[in-house]
């Protein structure tokens, strides 16, 4: 089971990871607009939750940690990638509502609901982006709910990484530029 403290700390770790690698992600940014700000926007979005998450007690529930993060990210979302990131967390949070701890099945369902929220909110979902990476990772998580959570998470991350590496085959602008999707890379870093 994952506790609220573990989830809180994992989200904070993700915020640190993207903050430290935002320039690298910015450099990948060629879709939908090559404005070089995907890493910055994702970092600012998840970073908007930092203070509120740090204020949560170690006894917080997964429901409290996820709702706190999702609410702050929604308020602080920047750019397309930031909005999609906040929606992934919003759906994730809704799936954990009322839960003290999360099982592997709970986490897989939360990832699925996050992906559904993001796809529903995007007018024209494009494959080969953060959406694809998130969806394929969530699908793998759903296949692995009988595993211990660390093993499930490793399999989920491996599926997300494989999906990320395939993004140039799905989106010609990425292949032409010789890069993977910036938003997909950002979500894998988080």
Language model feature labels by segment:
Residues 1-190:
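N-terminal loops that bind phosphate or other acidic moieties
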């Amino acid at each position: 089971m994952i506790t609220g403290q573990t989830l809180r700390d994992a989200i904070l770790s993700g915020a640190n990871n993207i903050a430290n690698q935002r320039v690298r992600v910015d450099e990948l940014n060629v879709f939908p607009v090559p404005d070089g700000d995907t890493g910055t926007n994702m970092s600012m979005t998840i970073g908007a939750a930092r203070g509120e998450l740090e204020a949560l007690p170690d006894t917080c529930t997964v429901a409290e940690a996820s709702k706190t993060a999702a609410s702050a990210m929604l308020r602080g979302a920047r750019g397309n990638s930031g909005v999609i990131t906040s929606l992934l967390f919003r759906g994730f949070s809704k799936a954990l509502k009322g839960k003290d701890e999360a099982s592997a099945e709970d986490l897989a369902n939360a990832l699925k609901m996050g992906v559904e929220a993001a796809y529903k909110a995007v007018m024209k979902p494009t494959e080969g982006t953060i959406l694809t990476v998130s969806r394929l990772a969530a699908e793998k998580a759903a296949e692995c709910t009988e595993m211990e959570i660390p093993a499930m998470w490793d399999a989920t991350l491996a599926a997300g990484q494989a999906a990320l590496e395939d993004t140039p085959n799905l989106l010609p602008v990425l292949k032409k530029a010789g890069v993977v999707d910036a938003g997909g890379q950002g979500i894998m870093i988080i």
